[in-house]
C-alpha cells in the first residue's frame, strides 16, 4: 500500500528551515543605497608634448619642461537609478569639443550618460593651453592626451564604486576674496579707443589719488563642501568636493635656476592640505576644490596700500590654500551623513547670441593690424592690436552658440555648472533663488564661453566685458542663464 501524498503546503513547511539556513549562509546583498568612487590622474604633458604653450596671459609663452605635476580629480556618485560625476582639471580653460569627446569615451567605458558627467577647469593660469585664448594656442597632441586622461579618470573612479554615505556643510573664509573690478573717477582709454568705461579691473593700489573709488560688486566668502565616506564599518573617509569663489592666485613655483613650472595653483595645494587635515595617512582619500562664481574676484585688496613685501614663487598659493582648507575642515566637522538620498540631474543647451563687431569696428581692426606693430617672441604687445586681432576672429563666430548648463541634486544639496567665468553676483543670486538648502555653482564646466557679466556690469565696461574670445556672449546672457537655472532647479525639486 502506497503512502498518501503529502500536501504541498506541508512540504513547503518542511523545507522552510532548510531554505532559511541556506539564505543565512549567503553573503548579505548590497543595499540599494548611495555609492561613490574616486580617482586622481596625472595630466602632466609627456616629454614628447613639450614645449607647450601655457594659458592665462594675453601673450603666448612656451614652457620647455616641468618638474611640477598637474592632475585631474574625479568623484563619481549616485544610486542604482542615477550616477553622475564631477571632474576638476588643472587647466585654465577647456573647450567644449574636447570635453564632449572625453565624456563620450567615459560614457562608453562606464555606461553613465554623457549628460550626467561634469568636467570643469580649475582656472589655474600655470597649465598647458587646452583652448585658444588671446595669443595662446593649444597643441592637438596635448588636447587628445587630455581628453583620454579625463575619460580614463572617470572610468577609474567608476570602477571603485562602493556603498557610501554623503553629507554637506558650508564654511566661510572672507580673508581671501576681493572684487577686482573698481569704479574709477579718472577716465581711461580701452583697447577699442573708447573713454566710456566706468570700471577698471585690477586698478592698482589706492595711494590717495582718488582714482579708485569703490568695488563694482560683492564677494562670496562661502566654502561649501560635499563629503563622502564609506558605508562599511569604520566609515572610512573617501572624498570631499569643495567650492570657493576665487579666480586663481598665480606666481607659481620656479626651479632653483628660475625656470617657470606648471602648477595646479591653490586648488592643487588645497587637495593636499585638506587631505592631511581630514584623512592623515590615507592615500585613497581625494579632496577636490572647484572654482565658484569668481569671474570678477581675486585675492588682492586694492582698497589700501600695497603690501610691505612680495611673495616668493608658490608662497601665496600655499597660504591661500591653507586658509581655505582650514575653513573647509571646520565645516567638515559639522557634516551629517546619510546612507540614502534622492539623486537627480538635468542638462540643457541654451542658445545665446554673440556680440559680433560692426563693419566700422572691423575696418578699425584691419587698419590697426596693417600699421607697423611691435612684436615680442611673435606676439603683439599693444593692447589695441591684441583686441583688433580678437575682433577679426569674433567676426567669424556664428551668430548664436549653444551654452551647456547642468544641474545636479543630491538630497537637499544642488550643484550647478556653467561654462562661463561667472560674475559673483550671479552665483549669489542663484543661491538665493534655489529651493534647496545648500547650493553652489562650479564655473568653467563642460566647455568655455567666456566671461559672464550682468547687463549692468556690461554697461560699466572694463576688461571682462571687452569683446574677445574671452568675452563674446550677448549682454543679456546672464539673465537668460539665471532663468534657465531656475527652471532646472524647479525640475530637480520635483524629481522623485
Give residue ranges: language-model regions.
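N-terminal secretory signal peptides that target proteins for export/translocation
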Residues: 1-12
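Boundary at the C-terminal end of the N-terminal hydrophobic targeting segment
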Residues: 25-32
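Anionic-ligand-binding alpha/beta catalytic cores of soluble enzymes and soluble regulatory domains
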Residues: 324
Amino acid at each position: 500500500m502506497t503512502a498518501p501524498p503529502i500536501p504541498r503546503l506541508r512540504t513547503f513547511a518542511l523545507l522552510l528551515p532548510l531554505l532559511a539556513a541556506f539564505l543565512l549562509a549567503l553573503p548579505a546583498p548590497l543595499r540599494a543605497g548611495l555609492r561613490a568612487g574616486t580617482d586622481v590622474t596625472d595630466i602632466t604633458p609627456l616629454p614628447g608634448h613639450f614645449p607647450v604653450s601655457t594659458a592665462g596671459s594675453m601673450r603666448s609663452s612656451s614652457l620647455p619642461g616641468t618638474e611640477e605635476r598637474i592632475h585631474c580629480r574625479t568623484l563619481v556618485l549616485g544610486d542604482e537609478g542615477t550616477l553622475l560625476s564631477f571632474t576638476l582639471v588643472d587647466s585654465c580653460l577647456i573647450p567644449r569639443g574636447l570635453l564632449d569627446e572625453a565624456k563620450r569615451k567615459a560614457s562608453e567605458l562606464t555606461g553613465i550618460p554623457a549628460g550626467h558627467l561634469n568636467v570643469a577647469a580649475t582656472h589655474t593660469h600655470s597649465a598647458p593651453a587646452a583652448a585658444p585664448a588671446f595669443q595662446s594656442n593649444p597643441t592637438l597632441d596635448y588636447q587628445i592626451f587630455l581628453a583620454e586622461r579625463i575619460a580614463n579618470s572617470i572610468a577609474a573612479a567608476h570602477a571603485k564604486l562602493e556603498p557610501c554615505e554623503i553629507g554637506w556643510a558650508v564654511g566661510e573664509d572672507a580673508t581671501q576674496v576681493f572684487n577686482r573690478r573698481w569704479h574709477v573717477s579718472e577716465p581711461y582709454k580701452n583697447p577699442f579707443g573708447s573713454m566710456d568705461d566706468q570700471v577698471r579691473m585690477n586698478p592698482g593700489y589706492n595711494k590717495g589719488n582718488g582714482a579708485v573709488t569703490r568695488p563694482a560688486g560683492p564677494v562670496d566668502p562661502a566654502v561649501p563642501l560635499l563629503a563622502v565616506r564609506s558605508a562599511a564599518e569604520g566609515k572610512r573617509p573617501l572624498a570631499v568636493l569643495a567650492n570657493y569663489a576665487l579666480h586663481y592666485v598665480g606666481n607659481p613655483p620656479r626651479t632653483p635656476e628660475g625656470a617657470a613650472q606648471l602648477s595646479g595653483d591653490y586648488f592643487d595645494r588645497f587637495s593636499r592640505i585638506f587631505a592631511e587635515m581630514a584623512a592623515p595617512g590615507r592615500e585613497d582619500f581625494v579632496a577636490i576644490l572647484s572654482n565658484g562664481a569668481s569671474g570678477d574676484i581675486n585675492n588682492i585688496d586694492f582698497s589700501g596700500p600695497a603690501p610691505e613685501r612680495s611673495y616668493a614663487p608658490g608662497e601665496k598659493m600655499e597660504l591661500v590654500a591653507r586658509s581655505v582648507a582650514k575653513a573647509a575642515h571646520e565645516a567638515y566637522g559639522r557634516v551629517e551623513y546619510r546612507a540614502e538620498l534622492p539623486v537627480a540631474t538635468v542638462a540643457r543647451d541654451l542658445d545665446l547670441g554673440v556680440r559680433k563687431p560692426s563693419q566700422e569696428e572691423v575696418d578699425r581692426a584691419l587698419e590697426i593690424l596693417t600699421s607697423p606693430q611691435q612684436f615680442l617672441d611673435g606676439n603683439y604687445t599693444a593692447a589695441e592690436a591684441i583686441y583688433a586681432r580678437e575682433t577679426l576672429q569674433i567676426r567669424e563666430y556664428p551668430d548664436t552658440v549653444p551654452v551647456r548648463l547642468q544641474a545636479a541634486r543630491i538630497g537637499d544639496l544642488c550643484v550647478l555648472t556653467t561654462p562661463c567665468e561667472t560674475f559673483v553676483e550671479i552665483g549669489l543670486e542663484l543661491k538665493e533663488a534655489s529651493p534647496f538648502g545648500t547650493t553652489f555653482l562650479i564655473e568653467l564646466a563642460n566647455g568655455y564661453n567666456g566671461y559672464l557679466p550682468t547687463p549692468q556690469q556690461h554697461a560699466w565696461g572694463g576688461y571682462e566685458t571687452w569683446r574677445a574670445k574671452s568675452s563674446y556672449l550677448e549682454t543679456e546672457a546672464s539673465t537668460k542663464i539665471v532663468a534657465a537655472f531656475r527652471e532646472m532647479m524647479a525640475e530637480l525639486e520635483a524629481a522623485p
